[in-house]
């Protein structure tokens, strides 16, 4: 693949746009679904939870989230206008029933009041955070006391084999992510690394190592 093509893939993964963006949203939902479910399960969702997700993509997983417990409210934040629209369309029933709420944001400031959420999660977004420490402090601010944050990401050892990650991506190992978290008031209360077979963005089957870090306020 040419450099320009790789750069285009990286840009679409960071911020899907246009027809290619819809395809990318569908593909990300399929290839990341195990990671997303792992993140959701580690939240240990309980009845009445208010849950925030950063960077939900097309949000094809929200139905699974609502199966975890009764009386949940889900709030999704997205930087991509296209994914925001797709997520609202795919989850239109939850939106009309006032169970799911989608908003756009700038990736830095979380447009919600302090201590609103009991659970927060984010999957495959950490590579794109412009100000990681600042964003973690924002998440800390909107979490309730004893609230849980799950950060799920593919390990640097896997990601650096993908040619497009040289653009736009800041890759993380578990150790690097832990060092980042140590700069914030969060406590790490759990971590798990799993390996799964996935089809790469270029089509072949590869082993992917991914990690979920479970943090508590």
Q: Which residues are covered by each model-predicted region?
A:
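N-terminal, positively charged/glycine-rich alpha-helical extensions of SAM-dependent methyltransferases
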Residues: 1-20
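A short glycine-rich, Lys/Arg-flanked "PGG" loop and its adjoining helix->strand segment in the class I
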Residues: 133-145
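Conserved class I S-adenosyl-L-methionine
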Residues: 148-178
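Conserved alpha-helix/loop element of class I SAM-dependent methyltransferases that forms part
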Residues: 30-49
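A short SAM/SAH-binding and catalytic strip from SAM-dependent methyltransferases
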Residues: 118-131
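A short acidic, Gly/Pro-enriched loop at the edge of an enzyme's catalytic core
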Residues: 108-119
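Core SAM-dependent methyltransferase catalytic element
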Residues: 184, 197-217
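Class I SAM-dependent methyltransferase SAM/SAH-binding core
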Residues: 50-109
């Amino acid at each position: 693949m040419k450099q320009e093509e790789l750069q285009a893939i990286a840009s679409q993964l960071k911020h899907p746009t246009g027809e290619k963006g819809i395809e990318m949203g569908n593909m990300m939902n399929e290839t990341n679904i195990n990671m997303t479910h792992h993140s959701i399960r580690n939240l240990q969702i309980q009845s009445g939870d208010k849950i925030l997700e950063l960077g939900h993509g097309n949000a094809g997983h929200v139905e699974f989230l609502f199966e975890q417990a009764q009386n949940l409210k889900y709030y999704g934040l997205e930087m991509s206008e296209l994914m925001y629209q797709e997520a609202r369309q795919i989850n239109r029933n939850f939106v009309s029933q006032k169970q799911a709420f989608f908003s756009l944001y700038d990736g830095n400031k979380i447009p919600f009041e302090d201590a609103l959420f009991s659970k927060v999660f984010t999957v495959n977004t950490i590579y794109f955070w412009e100000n990681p420490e600042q964003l973690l402090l924002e998440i800390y601010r909107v979490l309730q006391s004893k609230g849980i944050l799950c950060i799920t990401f593919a390990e640097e050892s896997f990601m650096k084999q993908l040619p497009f990650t040289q653009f736009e991506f800041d890759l993380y190992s578990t150790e690097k992510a832990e060092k980042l978290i140590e700069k914030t008031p969060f406590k790490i209360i759990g971590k798990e690394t799993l390996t799964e077979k996935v089809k790469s963005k270029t089509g072949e089957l590869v082993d992917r190592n991914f990690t979920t870090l479970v943090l508590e306020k």
